[in-house]
Amino acid sequence: MISMDKKDLTDRRPDILEGAPLHYAPKNELGVVFLFSHMLKKLRLTIDIIQPQYPDCIAYQKVGGGQKKIRIEFEFKSRNFKSQRHNPKGCDWIVCWEHNWPDIPNT
C-alpha cells in the first residue's frame, strides 16, 4: 500500500503550456515576468527599467511614430495588487497569470 502525505497532494505540477518558453504554468510572480518577457515583440514594447519597488517595470510601447510610457506591475494573482495596497494611479497595466479581482478599479 502506498502512503501519501498532504505535501504530496500540494506538490502536483501545474498545467503544461504547449509551445510556450516555460513548460509549465507559472507558480509565482517570477514565472509571470518570464512569460511576459517573451511577449515584448508582439506587444511592441521595450523595457526601460525592471525594479523591486512599485511599479515593477517601466516600458515603452511603439504607438504610431512615437513611444508611450507604460508602468507595469507584475502579480501572480491580480488581487495581490490590492492586498499590497498599491496606488492604482501609479500603474498602467497589471500583468498577472490569474485574474481574481472582480472589482478591479478602472483608471
Where would I find each of the regions flagged by the language model?
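Acidic-basic catalytic patches of nuclease active cores, encompassing PD-(D/E)XK
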Residues: 2-53, 60-63
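Structural alpha-beta junctions
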Residues: 42-44, 92, 107
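Short His-Asn-centered micro-motif
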Residues: 50, 73-75, 96-98
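Short, well-ordered alpha-helical microsegments
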Residues: 56, 79-81, 102
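Active-site beta-strand-loop-beta-strand hairpin of nuclease catalytic cores
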Residues: 58-71, 87-89
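Short beta-strand-loop-alpha-helix junction that forms the active-site gateway
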Residues: 73-83
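Short secondary-structure subsegments characteristic of cysteine-rich extracellular domains
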Residues: 83-99
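Domain-level recognition of nuclease-like catalytic cores that cleave nucleotide substrates
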Residues: 101-107
